[in-house]
């Protein structure tokens, strides 16, 4: 028994998406967001799908690609301080199951949104820009890269 230790990870951010039930909880949260938006009166179904997609992608961008560091006191000598959550995930190993899941989820949501908005031009452009804003930072070539110095410190 380890007294005084809550986990064995140096940085718990690296393994959080591999926790039991996290993928199901994530999908259920997206579904709950969609149902809450559907319950708003006088909002059409295409607008609700677009809002679901935009809110999901905005949240994903903020939490995975903007916020840096870790909320825990880690013994890693501050190595995680300058890394986003996406860069910390799975110790930086590319193409893991969690990374694939978090890459495919916005794509599936984009396809659903495009279908239910009947490929309306305005919705299509908004959803495509939103999708690109969360897919481009996930590319392995952009690991640790700060474009134009944005979010460098």
From Swiss-Prot:
Residues 1-17 are annotated as: Important for ceramide level-sensing. The keyword Signal does not apply. Residues 118-121 are lumenal. One of its GO terms (cellular component) is specific granule membrane. The keyword Zinc does not apply. Ceramides bind to ORMDL3 N-terminus and stabilize it in a conformation that physically restricts the accessibility of the substrates to their binding sites in the serine palmitoyltransferase (SPT) complex, hence inhibiting SPT catalytic activity. In the absence of ceramides, the N-terminus is flexible and permits substrate binding, thus liberating SPT from inhibition. Belongs to the ORM family. This is ORM1-like protein 3.
């Amino acid at each position: 028994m380890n007294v005084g230790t809550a986990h064995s990870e140096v940085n718990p951010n690296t393994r959080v998406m591999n926790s039991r039930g996290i993928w199901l909880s994530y999908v259920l949260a997206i579904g709950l967001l969609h149902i809450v938006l559907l319950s708003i009166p006088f909002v059409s179904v295409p607008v609700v799908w677009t809002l679901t997609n935009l809110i999901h992608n905005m949240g994903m961008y903020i939490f995975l690609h903007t916020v840096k560091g870790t909320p825990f006191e880690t013994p890693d000598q501050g190595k995680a301080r300058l890394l986003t959550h996406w860069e910390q995930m799975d110790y930086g190993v590319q193409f893991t199951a969690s990374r694939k899941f978090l890459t495919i989820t916005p794509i599936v949501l984009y396809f659903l949104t495009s279908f239910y908005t009947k490929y309306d031009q305005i919705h299509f452009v908004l959803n495509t820009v939103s999708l690109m804003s969360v897919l481009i930072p996930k590319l392995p070539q952009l690991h640790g890269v700060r474009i134009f110095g944005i979010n460098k410190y």
